[in-house]
């Protein structure tokens, strides 16, 4: 570059830096306003996430961006990231306490990651929370004495044993609930162990979420739903969406959503390991979609093997779903071995028809995710 070009670039970059500084000040102002919104919501007991308000605001900003010659998707991307930050800030303000005469909440397994998250959310809502972990059972009678809610969040393999052996003497009006990722057996165990209100939850997210806004919590009703309705309202105030399900229906879905998915991810990682694949080389030649897939595989192996063993081995029925997947894999491999391109296309079209309108919807959603993956690449 010649001296004139260098000078012009430095001048323009200086102007851009100035605009960026203005953006920072505007962001700070917006976050301060969000904090005020959080305070008002806290006082009124309003949910942290208001989907209609969010959708209307995004539609309006997209329309305004179009008028100004700015790509609508650009402003939507920026605003969605801002809203995620806003939900985190609103959470820190705290939440309205729906049930102010509850007594204490006892979290069995509260020193675990998910137990810790619910401990934080309940305390932000003004509840007195006590933790009972594996070394605290000698204090159990004292801890349970004034309990209005006992929340079980222990490894799946010992959940039912803990319920049957340790939770049979709770106060009659105490709510017994669990956060286990399977529901049929824990629900049966809770209903047998406790004569009072019983409800089962499955949070469809990990403990590393910064906010419950837009997250899903599955609820399986057990007994005396009117006694724990306040708890559903409290979870909704945290921003989560409540999805009701029968335990058996939930567990059947989890065979595909969790057990088979995690198992196939495990096998894919195992195959990469046994093939002695060089991850740096794979990343160097990866497309955004493969980088995302590899990230999801790596994410699994960054977490607790005991947790995923619990999920995969929890249901005997999962073996059937995984076995069906393996059979379909073998059949598809036979197509490849035979060189039957025509039948491959026929089956591809059959699956595309089965997906229906979801296929283009998922294509749009994944396009945005892949663009985000590309943005994060540094080399």
Swiss-Prot record:
Gene3D superfamilies recorded: 6-phosphogluconate dehydrogenase C-terminal like domain, Chorismate mutase, NAD(P)-binding Rossmann-like Domain
SMART domains: CM_2
Ranges where the Chorismate mutase domain occurs: 3-94
Example of a GO MF term: prephenate dehydrogenase (NAD+) activity
Known catalytic reactions: chorismate = prephenate; prephenate + NAD(+) = 3-(4-hydroxyphenyl)pyruvate + CO2 + NADH
Listed EC numbers: 5.4.99.5, 1.3.1.12
Pfam families: CM_2, PDH_C, PDH_N
Residue ranges crossing the lipid bilayer per the database entry: none
Record keyword Oxidoreductase present: yes
UniProt keyword Amino-acid biosynthesis, yes or no: yes
Subcellular location as annotated: Cytoplasm
Domain spans labelled Prephenate/arogenate dehydrogenase: 103-366
Any one Gene Ontology cellular component term annotated for this protein: cytoplasm
Alphabetical UniProt keywords: Amino-acid biosynthesis, Aromatic amino acid biosynthesis, Cytoplasm, Isomerase, Multifunctional enzyme, NAD, Oxidoreductase, Tyrosine biosynthesis
Main location group: cytoplasm
Pathway annotation from the record: Amino-acid biosynthesis; L-tyrosine biosynthesis; (4-hydroxyphenyl)pyruvate from prephenate (NAD(+) route): step 1/1; Metabolic intermediate biosynthesis; prephenate biosynthesis; prephenate from chorismate: step 1/1
GO biological process: chorismate metabolic process; tyrosine biosynthetic process
Top-rank taxon, per record: Bacteria
Family of this protein: In the C-terminal section; belongs to the prephenate/arogenate dehydrogenase family.
Name this protein carries in UniProt: T-protein
Record gene name: tyrA
